[in-house]
Amino acid sequence: MKANIHPDYHPVVFQDASTGTTFLTRSTVTSDRTALWSDGNTYPLVVVDVTSESHPFWTGAQRVMDTAGRVEKFERRYGVRKRP
C-alpha cells in the first residue's frame, strides 16, 4: 500500500439518538464530542439518527417518523388526498 494516502481509521463510539444505545466500532469519521467507554478510555462520540437498535427493519416495529411536522407541512401545501 502507498503511504500517507489513507484516512485515519480509529475507534469511535456511535450513539443512537432515539434509544441512547452506544456502539464502539472503528471508523474514519471524527467528532469534537467524546464519550467515556466501559474500558476506561475516551473515544470520539458521533450521534446518529438511526441504528439497528431503532430501525423498523431490525426491530420489527412499524412507526412513523415525523420530524418537525414535515407530513403536516406537506398536507397543508398540497392537500390531503382522499381515497375513492
Swiss-Prot record:
UniProt cross-references to PROSITE patterns, sorted A to Z:
RIBOSOMAL_L31 (PS01143)
What Gene Ontology cellular-component terms does the record carry? ribonucleoprotein complex; ribosome
| Transmembrane feature ranges | none
Give the domain of life.
Bacteria
Keywords from the UniProt entry = Ribonucleoprotein, Ribosomal protein
| BP GO annotations | translation
User: Gene3D superfamilies, from UniProt?
Assistant: Ribosomal protein L31
Q: Which GO terms describe its molecular function?
A: structural constituent of ribosome
Matching Pfam families: Ribosomal_L31
Which cysteine pairs are joined by S-S bonds?
A: none
Describe its assembly: Part of the 50S ribosomal subunit.
Q: What does this protein do?
A: Binds the 23S rRNA.
Q: Which family does it belong to?
A: Belongs to the bacterial ribosomal protein bL31 family. Type B subfamily.
The record's annotation in NCBIfam families points to:
L31, PRK01678.1
Name this protein carries in UniProt = Large ribosomal subunit protein bL31B
Name its species: Rhodococcus jostii (strain RHA1)
Originating gene: rpmE2
